[in-house]
Design a protein with these regions (language model features):
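N-terminal amphipathic/basic-hydrophobic helices that include classical n-h-c signal peptides
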Residues: 1-36
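Hydrophobic positions on the alpha1 helix immediately C-terminal to the Walker A/P-loop
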Residues: 205
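Conserved glycine(s) of the Walker
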Residues: 201
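A noncatalytic interaction/capping subdomain that flanks phosphate/NTP-handling catalytic cores
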Residues: 33-193, 198, 208-217, 225-332
Length: 332
């Protein structure tokens, strides 16, 4: 049986290799993903550089705007790499057994077990099914995010951002680095971090500082990154700022961590070590099923609370709350 091999182009712009068995007149279509079709962009967030490879027709200007302030010109090997690809069907990827679908609201996080101790992940706007699938390498260094071909343009930014947050967290947690769910303001050369459950009013409290505490500006409104660097604890702006477009490539010393809770009054108190740990720990992102990551997280949190004051603010959403907080934490 004779066979020839040739290339064709799908309407999506994807190249396919096709084998045509001339005798049987059977054509087999096989997707080909060539590296030369991709362009890798590199970004540095909190001193950690990573790479993102996009196929022809997808640009960082269109799909990675929040990352533009973090463009890296370094020749260093990236800590990890993420490649964006399309698939005719996510089911064909066979990501594995569904273990759980997490989060109370979108984006929903899916976890699949492909074999014991090895996982694939998904992200979605609803709990019906994953909209994209992340297939990591065993060491999480060379990873691929797949989206359905018909929805590639619509899902690209969503898929890339969620995948990069997960991979960044996994790869940097052992490096004295914490990604934290918090809102952070900058004031007089230092940063003040506000923690709390979703809906507590972290962003609201930050906005009160912006309005009532002169010289204050927003550093990040959802996912800043803390690094312990020598004796210093610094906090960085990131491309991940939730619904607020605040993508500042800046670093400041972390002066205080304040956990908020709603109350009919404004009262602040400093926390002892054990309560400081309990205040910060739930706000940190971590692959908690991975023992190495969890151990590293605990050690970094301990370093942070030993060097940064932690507080609890019972508060109203008013100007007095900002003043009470500022007067307690910003005078140190």
């Amino acid at each position: 049986m004779k066979a020839v091999f040739y290339l064709s182009v799908h309407e999506s712009g994807r190249f396919y290799g096709q084998t045509l068995h001339q005798d049987a007149k059977v054509r087999i279509k096989i997707p080909i993903f060539e590296r030369f079709m991709e362009k890798m962009y590199k970004y540095t967030v909190a001193g950690h550089t990573f790479g993102v490879s996009l196929p022809e027709g997808f640009t960082q200007e269109e799909y990675l705007k929040p990352y533009m302030p973090f463009i890296s010109e370094t020749d260093d090997e990236p800590l990890f790499r993420l490649t964006f690809k399309t698939a005719d069907s996510l089911r064909e990827l066979d990501p594995g057994k569904v273990l759980e679908c997490l989060n109370d609201e979108a984006p929903y996080f899916w976890m699949f077990e492909k074999e014991e101790g090895k996982y694939n992940f998904g992200f979605s706007y609803s709990k019906n099914r994953p909209d994209c699938i992340l297939v990591p390498s065993d060491d999480y260094k060379d990873n691929t995010i797949y989206v359905p071909t018909p929805y590639a343009e619509r899902l690209a930014e969503f898929a890339l951002s969620n995948a990069m947050m997960l991979l960044y967290t996994f790869n940097t947690t052992p490096l004295d680095t914490l990604m934290v769910h918090a809102s952070v303001v900058a004031h007089e050369g230092g940063a003040y971090m506000f923690l709390g459950r979703s809906g507590t009013g972290k962003s609201t409290h930050s906005s009160l500082w912006l309005k009532h505490i002169a010289g204050t500006y927003l550093l990040n409104d959802d996912n800043p990154v803390i690094r312990v660097e020598g004796d210093a604890v610094n906090i960085y702006g990131t491309p991940w700022s939730g619904k607020t477009p605040c993508y500042k490539n800046e670093v400041l010393p972390l002066k205080a961590s304040v956990r908020l809770s709603q109350a009919p009054h404004n009262l602040i108190k400093r926390l002892p070590a054990l309560q400081s740990y309990a205040s910060l720990m739930p706000a940190c992102s971590c692959m908690r099923w991975d023992r190495k990551s969890t151990d590293a997280l605990h050690k970094t949190v301990e370093k942070v609370i030993s060097r940064v004051g932690c507080w609890h603010l019972e508060c109203l959403p008013d100007a007095d709350a900002a003043n009470v907080c500022h007067d307690a934490v910003a005078v140190l």
